[in-house]
Amino acid sequence: MNFKVIFAAASLLATQAFAIAGIGFHYSPNVGTTLKTGKQAPLKVNDQVYPVEFSHGDFDYIQGFGFKAWIDILPFVDVEGTFNIQFASYNATLWADGEPHRLEIELGGTPFAKATPKFIAMNADISVTKPFSIPLFPIRPYVGAGLTIYWNTFILNNAFVEGVLERSGKDLSGSSAKEIADALAKNVVDAAKDKGLNKSVGFHLLAGARFKLPIIPIAAYANVKVYLGGEYDSDIDAGHVAFELGGGFAL
């Protein structure tokens, strides 16, 4: 009896344990992407120094989530498509007579409401991978590469605020520091709403594995991706390495 059970289990594992297609959801942190602190400094336009200062905070990493769909039925290669959203928060402050005026920004084109400024990076990947088989184990490792389309937001920095100040400078002449800060805060928020997403194209390399037991229509997967190319705001130090850890439904 024990021999029959062992034989049946081995036969089951030896059968095709991988889906012809699947869709999943995953956690996706990006390693090494950082923003350095923008130190408090006076705002200056055309050699005119205003009695208002600006500063912004920093972050050490970004994290997020994503979705993936894949096809395993093709001969020799698999194909997968991924969409990731990663983000981090930082503060931005106008200073008037030593008093902080915190800025809350609604970044157009992103699924986030008005809040402290956020850096948001989105990417869509299409990948072609070469799978490998491990006999008697329901694991499908693979390596591959593909095309990436990037979208990301700008950083609310000194240059952006000075640009807004330059466009509204005449209306603020003769005002007190507090009046300038109050008016400038509103103008910055309005300008940020109209600021679109940066878009660029690049490539990526990936290595990963999918795990799926026979018959059960559930799969788990893990990927590591190295991104090549892509354009970011000059204040962003992009890490170019992301992980995907998740699972989903597979047929």
Question: Which stretches of residues belong to each language-model region?
Answer:
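Cleavable N-terminal export/targeting peptides
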Residues: 1-21
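Short stretches within intrinsically disordered, low-complexity N-terminal or propeptide regions
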Residues: 10-12, 16, 110-111, 115, ...
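Short glycine/proline- and aromatic-enriched beta-strand/turn motifs that initiate or cap beta-hairpins
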Residues: 18-72
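Outer-membrane beta-barrel "beta-signal"
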Residues: 22-24, 239-251
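Gram-negative (and chloroplast) outer-membrane scaffold detector with strong preference
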Residues: 27-31, 68-170, 216, 251
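Extracellular loop and loop/strand-boundary signature of outer-membrane beta-barrel proteins
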Residues: 49-56, 108-117, 189-195, 229-235
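Residues that define the transmembrane beta-barrel architecture of outer-membrane proteins
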Residues: 59-65, 118-124, 139, 199-203, ...
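Outer-membrane beta-barrel transmembrane domain signature
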Residues: 129-237, 249-251
